[in-house]
Regions:
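Extended alpha-helical surfaces
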Residues: 1-185
């Protein structure tokens, strides 16, 4: 019953434009969730991330596991393709990437404008997340879906062209100098 109360209090994230602010803050979302979720679900919620490590711990949620696997694979594919483009080595492990992830990574790497590449990747991530959307709107996985979507929307709302150029130059220099700042932890 508590899941009904929680989901009924969350504003819809559907149809939010690229530059529109989200209708709820991440802090408020977490406050509401901590009132209604059990301890295990709260732990899973607190571990939601847009940047999972290479060797992430499996959660009790198939949605979180699918998200972490796909996001890790996307980041590794991007790293590998960017390194190949600059004729550098990149250890992507023994990963065999799904075709959709390879196509998205290739498209992003081929884009000349880093901001457009980030917008493309964010759109790709939102589309992928939509494929994971649970049928049951009142399940824990629906809360995790909402949390990940909110994180992606918040991330997109923070895109800043000048800061992006500075970060791009920093990562590019890191690759050329072998500092490996671009590598997943």
């Amino acid at each position: 019953m508590s899941m009904y109360y929680l989901m009924a209090q969350l504003p819809s994230l559907d149809g939010i434009g690229e530059n529109a602010p989200p209708p709820i803050t991440e802090e408020r979302f977490h406050e509401l969730c901590h009132c209604f979720l059990g301890k295990k679900a709260q732990r899973n919620l607190d571990r939601l991330t847009l940047a999972p490590p290479r060797d992430f711990e499996k959660s009790g949620s198939s949605l979180i596991n699918a998200w972490n696997t796909a996001e890790r694979d996307l980041r590794l594919a991007l790293g590998k393709m960017r390194a190949e483009q600059m004729q550098k080595n990149f250890d992507a492990g023994d990963a065999a990437f799904p075709v959709g992830i390879l196509q998205a990574a290739r498209t992003a790497v081929e884009m000349e404008n880093p901001m457009e590449a980030e917008k493309f990747l964010n759109h790709y991530r939102l589309e992928f997340l939509e494929t994971l959307r649970p049928m049951d709107m009142f399940s824990e996985d629906s809360v995790f879906y909402y949390g990940l979507k909110l994180k992606l929307i918040l991330r997109a709302s923070r895109f800043d062209t000048s800061a992006g150029k500075a970060a791009y130059r920093n990562i590019y220099s890191s690759i050329l100098n072998g500092d490996r700042l671009e590598v997943l932890s």
